[in-house]
Amino acid sequence: MALPNKFFLWFCCFAWLCFPISLDSLPSRGEAQIVARTALESEAETWSLLNHLGGRHRPGLLSPLLKVLYDGHGEPPRLQPDDRALRYMKRLYKAYATKEGTPKSNRRHLYNTVRLFTPCAQHKQAPGDLAAGTFPSVDLLFNLDRVTVVEHLFKSVLLYTFNNSISFPFPVKCICNLVIKEPEFSSKTLPRAPYSFTYNSQFEFRKKYKWMEIDVTAPLEPLVASHKRNIHMSVNFTCAKDQLQHPSARDSLFNMTLLVAPSLLLYLNDTSAQAFHRWHSLHPKRKPSQGPDQRRELSAYPVGEEAAEGVRSSRHRRDQESVSSELKKPLVPASANLSEYFKQFLFPQNECELHDFRLSFSQLKWDNWIVAPHKYNPRYCKGDCPRAVGHRYGSPVHTMVQNIIHEKLDSSVPRPSCVPAKYSPLSVLAIEPDGSIAYKEYEDMIATKCTCR
């Protein structure tokens, strides 16, 4: 008997390995969550499990974020950004996102990506003439390989960040002279006249600064739109010389232009499907060329929150009442307690609802390049769907019809499943392989509402 027992045990293990757990079946989902909590102790085991949870059965649970982030896993050590630039981006993240990592609803910007680049090369040029109010110019080269073709520029600034605040005793008016130069070409390319574009921006220094931004959108917009990988620019400041007589004002500007290399900050709109598009959240109900008849027709089929509010036409309300009455007919013994019946079938104990799935990027050993958020809770839906689903779940009439088919006609037709009905986006601040810093907003990353379908 020992040999058949061993063979049976081997066969069960082999079958378990060959047929992955389906997240669409309720018992296996519960088992998968138990395994997930114990597997977080090991990075390899954790990724294997999370990859399974974010696979073809449940693409919305952990993908696309973990899949996108894992693409860089195992690369050589990443370049670390400048501390001042990192502090600035952390401050930007706090202004744009909550502690849970969701974009703040009171923000009205239409971009979903902010990239900060530090110069990959820096050279001093003309020494300048402080007596005439002209400060030394600096030659800068920025590499924009991380900007993708689906990212469109909204705004670009030169960012000066300081360890200590610089102060000015009185306002100082200056002009930033920016010269965009064409990169040098190899001898194999056809010779052409050198290209340069000069851009002047006027601004005024006031009081204390921990950072300073100079808008350079106009000269950079055509270069980013044409997907230029390298941007070569020369920057210098010219200030009114009569306002530089005060030593503190002159020293502050001198330290800023010589001791601090500016970063390039790009505000972009990622148009890919996995990015969060804030315009749709600001105008969720706007549809092109929609007449009154179309609006009435659409309102008859509400989903998500609209269905939860009970926005239905009278015709569908009558359909639901007739189906509900049909559901109440079958097989209720005369001696049965109606309250127990409704408790068992209409409101099951393991009711469909949201559950937490908390993970930490430090457990995945990704916290050295995922700066924020520190923790991620995608949440998931689990539980039994009641036989007569009402407005609370926002389920369509088809869900009730499916229940009737399962119970009366064909048991092979599955019962409605407990699935997410609504999601919220997630904001992520990460260090890229080249040492640049990226703030990105990902769509549909946190389940916020469950339904039965």
Swiss-Prot record:
Basic and acidic residues compositional bias, start-end: 318-328
Molecular function (Gene Ontology), one example: cytokine activity
Disulfide bond residue pairs: 352-418, 381-450, 385-452
Record's comment on post-translational modification: Phosphorylated; phosphorylation is critical for GDF9 function.
Signal peptide (UniProt feature, chain positions): 1-27
Compartments, record wording: Secreted
Keywords, sorted A to Z: Cleavage on pair of basic residues, Cytokine, Disulfide bond, Glycoprotein, Growth factor, Phosphoprotein, Secreted, Signal
Major localization listed first in the record, in broad terms: secreted
Keyword Glycoprotein (UniProt): yes
Residues linked to a glycan: 163, 236, 255, 269, 337
Single GO cellular component term: extracellular space
Propeptide: 28-318
Residues forming coiled coils: none
Disordered, as annotated region: 282-328
Keyword Phosphoprotein applies: yes
Its job: Required for ovarian folliculogenesis.
Family: Belongs to the TGF-beta family.
Subunit structure and binding partners: Homodimer or heterodimer (Potential). But, in contrast to other members of this family, cannot be disulfide-linked.
Misc remark: Ovarian physiology and fertility are controlled by endocrine and paracrine signals. These act in a species-dependent manner and determine the ovulation quota in different mammalian species. While humans, and mammals such as the cow or red deer, normally ovulate only one egg per cycle, other mammals such as mouse and pig can ovulate in excess of ten per cycle. The mechanisms that regulate the species-specific differences in the number of follicles that go onto ovulate during each reproductive cycle are poorly understood.
Name of the protein: Growth/differentiation factor 9
Source species: Capra hircus
